[in-house]
């Protein structure tokens, strides 16, 4: 896989082309990603680069984490992320920023979707509601039957039912990079990306890029 970067969702806006076409974009702040470890096949069995981003108070860093960051001689960040590599070399302390992307490139953006709490089947799985009238009472938003009788005598795994919705890992694929602002460490991506404003995002070159 090709290396990506970790960023923070700033929100959405729009920009205009020279022809006056409005393009909705998500603004992603790409703070410099600090390399904390470079893994090789000889030492770890695979090639990867491990990065951290942002800052974290010393009181919020465990002793094990503090030792790991100190060994790499980098400041403690708000998390640790890893990218598999097929080629390229990095050293602890190297910086990776938004300049690895270019305008017009397609990227995959991964984040944690907004949590919706406990949701019914209509909101969670787009079930249709039952009749409002015609003899129906107190069953307008219920899912209906969830299985058969004695055979098989159980509810199949994976049955779509009510439950916790959102707050899960989501990847949106093949979004176009509209603009790269290297001075302000900003990446403008066409369309919406998962998660709330301020959430962590992982931006990688598109795995299924067309052409």
Swiss-Prot record:
Superkingdom of the organism of origin: Bacteria
This protein's record includes keyword Plastid: no
Residues bearing PTM N5-methylglutamine: 150
SUPFAM superfamilies xref list: Translation proteins
Keyword terms: Methylation, Ribonucleoprotein, Ribosomal protein, RNA-binding, rRNA-binding
UniProt modification remark: Methylated by PrmB.
Gene Ontology process terms (BP): translation
GO CC terms: cytosolic large ribosomal subunit
InterPro entries, per the entry: Ribosomal_uL3, Ribosomal_uL3_bac/org-type, Ribosomal_uL3_CS, Transl_B-barrel_sf
Listed GO MF terms: rRNA binding; structural constituent of ribosome
Subunit structure as annotated in this protein's UniProt entry: Part of the 50S ribosomal subunit. Forms a cluster with proteins L14 and L19.
Homology family: Belongs to the universal ribosomal protein uL3 family.
General function of this protein: One of the primary rRNA binding proteins, it binds directly near the 3'-end of the 23S rRNA, where it nucleates assembly of the 50S subunit.
UniProt name for this protein: Large ribosomal subunit protein uL3
Organism field: Pseudomonas fluorescens (strain ATCC BAA-477 / NRRL B-23932 / Pf-5)
Phylogenetic lineage: Bacteria, Pseudomonadati, Pseudomonadota, Gammaproteobacteria, Pseudomonadales
């Amino acid at each position: 896989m090709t290396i990506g970067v970790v960023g923070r969702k700033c929100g959405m806006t729009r920009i205009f082309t020279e022809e006056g076409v409005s393009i909705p974009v998500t603004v992603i702040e790409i703070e410099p990603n600090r390399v904390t470890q470079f893994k090789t096949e000889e030492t770890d069995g695979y090639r990867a680069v491990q990065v951290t981003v942002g800052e974290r108070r010393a009181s919020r860093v465990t002793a094990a984490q503090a030792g790991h960051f100190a060994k790499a001689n980098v400041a403690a960040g708000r998390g640790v992320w890893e990218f598999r590599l097929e080629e390229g070399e990095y050293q602890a302390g190297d910086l990776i920023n938004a300049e690895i992307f270019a305008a017009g490139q397609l990227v995959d953006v991964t984040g944690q979707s907004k949590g919706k709490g406990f949701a019914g089947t209509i909101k969670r799985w787009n079930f249709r509601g039952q009749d409002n009238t015609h003899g129906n009472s107190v069953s307008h938003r219920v899912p209906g039957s969830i299985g058969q009788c004695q055979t098989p005598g159980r509810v199949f795994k994976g049955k779509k039912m009510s439950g916790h919705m959102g707050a899960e890992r989501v990847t949106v694929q093949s979004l176009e990079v509209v603009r790269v602002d290297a001075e302000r460490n900003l990446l403008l991506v066409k369309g919406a990306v998962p998660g709330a404003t301020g959430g962590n995002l992982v931006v990688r070159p598109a795995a299924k890029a067309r052409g």
